């Protein structure tokens, strides 16, 4: 009898303690989630893409890098290329770069990349190339083949002054190298850089940032953290829907205001909503840009032109395919 009494008196005490701990744990998790994603970023500006010619007369659609939005630190430019391969065949012949990085993303078709050091490679559908121009690269980007569509993007990212004369470097990734997170029914996120759902993208960045290709079926939703203090935007390339409560449509960049996360919902159309989500920590330094050179002073721009004209822009000892990871 004594043993039975002891069991009966312990059981309620244990149950109350367990329930109290469970409630405290759930409350803590809820508060943590709420505090982590407390401020939805508003859309402060919508930039419509402008059609213009680049390279050997190839038509592109530009949002960042126009008179409407000169730059969004650390981002200098975003172009979308969407043409029949035949119409873009003239491509982008040899041209120089210094002082920044580029990211080329292909959805359809192939671009062949060559530089003055004899390096070459092909970026195919789903592929990504992150190129650190650093102290100097001279290269070409040409369509490979004339069949089908050529559809992709090129993003220019500034480098801080301390890294502008770093050694050039390439990071090439094929479709299978980029993780895809099915974050909710009908929502997929290709994580090129940054983190989504605990999955980290492969691109190594000198300046903290994120780069994602988000695809939402009609009615599907996604939420992505974007750290406080970062600048960012979403570029819609297909379909329609809403991003942070604002209407999203193709060839438009939606500029993110202050906050710590973004949300998006696919529209009712058959294509849902597809967009690039791009955000990064601002560098906060002067941006002096002249064509393919981006430095912090006018004198550095003059020096870049002198180096290019004298054949000293790219150091013969540099091999971007063997970049020094220790510099990252």
Model-inferred region functions:
Residues 2-5, 11-328:
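Jelly-roll (double-stranded beta-helix
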